[in-house]
Amino acid sequence: MEMAYTELNAKLCAFLDKTPNSFFAVKNIKEELAAAGFTELQENSRWQLQAGGKYYVSRNGSALLAFVIPQKAYLGFQVYACHCDSPAFKLKNNAEIVVDKKYVKLNVEKYGGMLLNTWLDRPLSVAGRVLCNVDGRLEARLVNVEQDLMMIPNLAIHMNREANDGVKLNAQTDMLPLIGSAATKDGLQKLLAEACGVTAEQIVDTELFLYNRMPATTVGLEQEYVAGGRLDDLQCVFAGLQGFLAAEAGESVPVFCVLDNEEVGSGTKQGAAATFLKDALQRINMALGRDEEDYLVSLANSLMLSADNAHAVHPNHTDKNDLTNKTYPNEGVVVKYSANQKYTTDAVSGALVQLLAKKANVPLQLFYNRSDMAGGSTLGNISTSQVAIKSVDIGLAQLAMHSTYEMAGVKDTAYLAKLAQAFFAAAVAEAADGTYFLK
């Protein structure tokens, strides 16, 4: 593979490995933005913005929005929206269960539509947010237990002879991870307290998710595929961030937006159904002395890329995809269409992204679900219910979506980063006669 792909995907693998969930995604993105000279804003304070300024704001520690103010009066917003959550098991409170006075297992629940069997028989750990009582103040501390801590063991075939005929796994009875012997009871709480630098009694509440400890890597005879956890949607997050940091602001405001809870419907204060994006765009408008009419004009001259990975043709199940629109790893950015509006792409936004990709020399692929399969939806159509702007759903073709270990193409990371860079530097205008311009 070309060196550019190799270097970029080495960075992607490192990003995947240090990003076990949405809290760490935002933490890691903040660090990159700060290193690039961005200033952090707070939602609970007034914003003072300047031409040429670079800023970011977060919500709940699990969603983030970054933007750059152009030197001149801006035309609209170029919004790249993606999500940083992935299907996983979430640890319940009072999680420890002692079995036969011999084992300690943990009580967990599903987060999102996961492939359950992929969580069996592999090293797991836990990461997330811990709320601690420190001198009467609640402090949120991020914890990642970076060791092979637990496993969900399969039932041996000798005890389940029908295993290879298909097993229906029950999340409550079959998927509880083994963390230690009975002698280790209360050990997880002590481990978390040590990681937080507090006593176990100071831990008030937690939001902790299991994750696969297997590091991301590249595979294939030519190392043409990247494999790892949470490629959906961290591959789009990573590529979008690279394009955002490399872009020069044009006539519109480039906006890099990372949302949470897409895998469970986006209906949270930090999800696409909330007002996070809308609030930020309105505050940018107000902080620069523009009125409501200016804001509405800007929305009419805006475009959003809703970036979320797509299904590649599976080599063992080629009949699961559309008859004439097939997508493959390493063959370009995917543009998604849906007659039922599960995806936001229409003829206008689809044409605009085609012009943009041609200008950036980035190949595109088209995706439709089979006509007899419902398929999934993305954050795009949810976001546009809050901010009504032209939008196109894109992504990268991947295999094993919602597995704990997924697979995609190494070239596509670079393709999307290049497209994102061109997108952030561009501007879209709609004329009175109904024609559109890409600047």
For the regions a protein language model found, what residue spans apply to each?
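N-terminal hydrophobic/helix-forming segments and targeting peptides
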Residues: 1-439
